[in-house]
Structure formats: C-alpha cells, structure tokens
Amino acid sequence: MPAIGILMVGRWMSNAAVRIEMVKMAKGREIKVTRWRHDPLSDDPWRPYGVRHQIVEHSDILLGWISSMESKPTDTVTVHMGTNLLEGDLDDRPRIVDQINRKECRDEWRQLWTDRFNEGRVSLMGKSLVWDIDDPDDLETAFETADAIASELTKHVAMPEHAPRVVFSGGKGFHVWIVDENAVQHLCRSLVGAEVSEMTAKKRAAAHREVIKEICQRAIGRSIHHLDQAPNHRQGIIRCPYAVHERTGQIVWPLDVDELERLRDGDGIDWSSPVALAKSIHPWEIPVQSPMAEALGVESTWIHPEASVKDRGMPTYG
C-alpha cells in the first residue's frame, strides 16, 4: 500500500472544513508543526527533521506549512497547539523555522516568549486545561477514566458552552478539555482557592496542575498513573484536534454526543488498538499503510472523514 506521509496529510489539511475548524481552535495560540523523516538505516528509524513554531492567524498558515515541508512521501508531519491564549503585536511574535534539534528548539522558543512576556510585548489572555490520559495497554480503561473526569467537571461548570470536551488522541488515550478561561478561573477558585487572574504565568500553571489532580481524585478516587501534565505547564502544548497522529495515521478526533454514547455502551466497539478504535468511532476511506506504523510493526490505516468534521462540539478558542 502507499504510505501515509506529507502528501496524505496535505490532502487532509487542504480540506476546507478541516482547516477552518483547526484555525477556529488554534487562533491566537502557539502552533508547532514537526516533520518526521523515515531513515531505515538509523538506530531510530523515525526522527524529527524540521520543527516550526508560529502563531496562527488564518488557515493558509497551516496549509502553507504542510506544503512547504513537503519532501519524501514517506515523511509525515504532526501539529500541536498551545493551551495558552496570547495577545500581542503580530509582527513581533516569535517564530522558529527548521530546527532539527528538538531540545534546542524548545529552549529557544521558551526564551523568545520569556523575553516578550518580561518586556510586556505579549500578554497571557487565558489558559485551557487538558486532562491527557494515556493507557496504551487498555484504551477502554483510558476512555472510562476520561468519561469520569468529564462527568465530574460538569458538576463544577454550569454553562453548557463551557462544558468539557472529550477528544480521542488518535493514539494511546483521550484528552478532556476545558477551554473557556472563565470556567478555568472558576475551577481554580472553587477547588484549590486560587485567584489565577492575579498570578504570574508560573504560579498560574502550578494552580492549574492542582486543579487537574483534584478533579482526578474526585472523579475516580485516586491519582492517575497515565496522566500527562505537560499540556498544563506554563507553555504547554497538546495535539491539535483534527491533526494526524504520526505513529498510527489516525486523526485526533473530538467525540460528539452520539459517539460518546456508543463508547459508553461498548457494543460493537473494538478497543484492541488505536486503529481499531478509530474505525469503530467514525467513517473510513482509502486504506493506506502508515510508514511509521509499519516500521514499528503496528497496524494502521488512513481515514478521511472530512464530511463529519463540522460542529463536533469543540468551541472556538479565544
């Protein structure tokens, strides 16, 4: 079978519905696009070849990046977005292009933003909270945990438009989002007694992580071993909804009400792998083997359900 790579990701990203929904969510936030190159002779057959950071203002940026990073059809790309909502001079916002060393890129990016924050050229306008739940050995348990967290959050967030959203990561777990800054501030006040609007970004991040832990404790009565707190760090990022997971070839998929009910019921749901679960959730087209998955010995098939992208419950960010 042909490979899922830049060309296939480009086809998905060039779809108008996909681009519009991604940019609605990512506008005013950090976007990180990473290109992965397949080198079968290397000890690590998959390595990042280029990393780009930017702030998204319109959909052509995303499509332009995918097009400009086009190389071998066996390469693939990933798209992450920041959990911070930022405001500042667009012309002065930092950008990094084609860094091969991910650590150097991360450190440089942090310094660029720190300088602008300290000088007052960029302001933190809000923060989304994300419960990132991974359980590669038991996707059903990962979903049950995510569903319990979302249920607990609805007890504390009254407005329907602020309700938690559950997203299948396309890989080994689920993300639970609280997007609205007012809802985040309310959770911080009511659960951990923190007035985050008056805090520095660093102290704010610490309060956010305490909220994450408190909700987990209330939802399932214990801490979660497979909970990743990285999205809630001061400059946290997470896979952008509707992006493609590079290792499985599956889409980061926001779950609508009907899909959530099907997963809760469990009838006809195949939890054996991310690919099988994706097939249970949404329509498929065009079977295509992922080169990264093939190298890792993992089943993978490309899916292309553009018609189901709109109105999936993920609100506009910002």
Task: Go through the PLM ranges and name each one.
Residues 254, 271-274:
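Acidic/polar low-complexity flexible segments
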Residues 120, 164-170, 229-232:
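Short beta-strand
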Residues 1-128, 133, 139-143, 194, ...:
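DNA replication initiation on ssDNA origins
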